[in-house]
Amino acid sequence: MSEEVPVIKLEDWKPRTKVGQLIKEGKINSMKELFERNLPIVEPEIVDVLLPKLRYDIVDIGIVQKQTDAGELSRYKVLIVMGNMDGYISYGTGKAKQLRVAIQKAIRDAKMRIIPVRRGCGSWECTCGESHSLPFIVSGKAGSVEVTLLPAPKGTGLVVGSVLKTFLSLAGLKDVWSRTKGSTYTHENFIKAAYIALYNTYRFVTPVDWGRMK
């Protein structure tokens, strides 16, 4: 079950970068505008202000050990997925001695990775024209894992595994098929491959976009 991402209040935020200052002053008012101006997310508070209704879900909690002079040091490692269920998605990892701190670090990491997801109706079996699926087939690879996401007709649902279903739901996708290769049980590479696939929705320019680029 996803939970709401904690955010900082605008009046409590003291920007440390030029981009942050522009947002604080109201010169950039949306995440869409930030990406259109090709500006990076350099502070997690930027996401708090521009995307205040994010939700996250914990995908994996593990324990990692490191050998030190004082003996073995154990820490929690957390993997989360994050999105606003309306076209923005991310994932993040965090390590700490305390689980709560590891989750906070993962949330902060995910905020810095937020990307837009292009949605559409790309299945030849569906002509509704609504943004319920993907506009075309996309793929992503991380390590040995490769994920291919395919547009599905309206009403199909997310015909994917449980981990991927959570991720795609947070992106606002409703109807998708998938093909996977490699060690999908390694959740971090699995999610990263899916993240790269969704990132690729904006790397391909369709004929519809040609007029917008003039």
Curated annotation (Swiss-Prot):
Q: Name one GO biological process term.
A: translation
Q: Which SUPFAM superfamilies match?
A: dsRNA-binding domain-like, Ribosomal protein S5 domain 2-like
Q: Residue ranges of the S5 DRBM domain?
A: 54-117
Q: Name one GO cellular component term.
A: cytosolic small ribosomal subunit
Keyword Ribonucleoprotein in the entry? The reply is yes
The parts of the chain that form a coiled coil are: none
Q: Which domain of life is it from?
A: Archaea
What keywords appear on the UniProt entry? Ribonucleoprotein, Ribosomal protein, RNA-binding, rRNA-binding
GO MF term set: rRNA binding; structural constituent of ribosome
Q: Which Pfam families match?
A: Ribosomal_S5 (PF00333), Ribosomal_S5_C (PF03719)
Q: How does it assemble?
A: Part of the 30S ribosomal subunit. Contacts protein S4.
Family designation: Belongs to the universal ribosomal protein uS5 family.
Described purpose of this protein according to its UniProt entry: With S4 and S12 plays an important role in translational accuracy.
Entry note about domains: The N-terminal domain interacts with the head of the 30S subunit; the C-terminal domain interacts with the body and contacts protein S4. The interaction surface between S4 and S5 is involved in control of translational fidelity.
Name under which the protein is recorded:
Small ribosomal subunit protein uS5
From which source organism is this entry?
Sulfolobus acidocaldarius (strain ATCC 33909 / DSM 639 / JCM 8929 / NBRC 15157 / NCIMB 11770)
